[in-house]
Amino acid sequence: DDELALLMGGETTEGLVDEDQVPELVDDPVTVLGDVWLLGNHRLMCGDSTSIDAVERLMDGQKADMVFTDPPYGISIVNDSGHVGGDKLAKVGVYAPIAGDETIDVAIEAIQVIKTLSAKVEIIWGGNYYANVLDNSSCWIVWDKDNTGNFADAELAWTNQPTAVRIFKHTWNGMIKASEHGQKRVHPTQKPVKLAEWCFDEYGEKCATVLDLFCGSGSTLIACEAKKKTGYMMELSPHYCDVIIKRWQDFTGKQATLESNGKTYNELLNDNQAKNTD
């Protein structure tokens, strides 16, 4: 399957819903810390991305050809009015906390793990916040948001590639993606799927496997599905793991299963709901 995907190059598979459509957070997630979920060919682990043991369990003996990730980098996202960025509809408290977002320490530890993997392609968003622990690079990616909101007009990603600086233009106005269907964010650092797809086409055409150590709301996973790459996703928050699973299920129409017992996510969700009504 991986070889076929590489031969198909930049083709993109359409989903059953818009690629940036994200389910709402749930109060009582099915996922618990340590769970590994199987989503078609992909793997999702609820675990610590700074733990080499956890990453090895996620990879299950496979090697990551590409690392594409967006670590937390310890910056406040709340503006003076008490809103998150430019979205007047999204109040603080909509989001589950991001583990490690108080400092850049988690990002730095994760970068040390990434260095042990020797992936052919490494793309790390927010690399400008911890450039002192990254190797010098001639190839930074600039995401030009064409932004009229309160968030930054652009974001930077460090890469290990030898090419020149590249610019990706995609409108994302604060919390609202203005260029297409206006889907609201569920995760405060959520990025458009088109951004990951563009990076896959530009830098990862020969990469069959993609690792994201901070999967968040699951945009990287949806890009892997669309571009026929095998995704290995790590996310510490059980709440966001549930979002990722439901997002992938909505996009594909398929069922995720828990590796430990083979039960589907929907079966376990029904079990949870039954317990809560007892």
Segments predicted by a language model, with ranges:
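Class I S-adenosyl-L-methionine-dependent methyltransferase catalytic core
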Residues: 10-211, 215-278
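Amphipathic, charge-rich alpha-helical segments that serve as recognition/docking helices
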Residues: 1-9
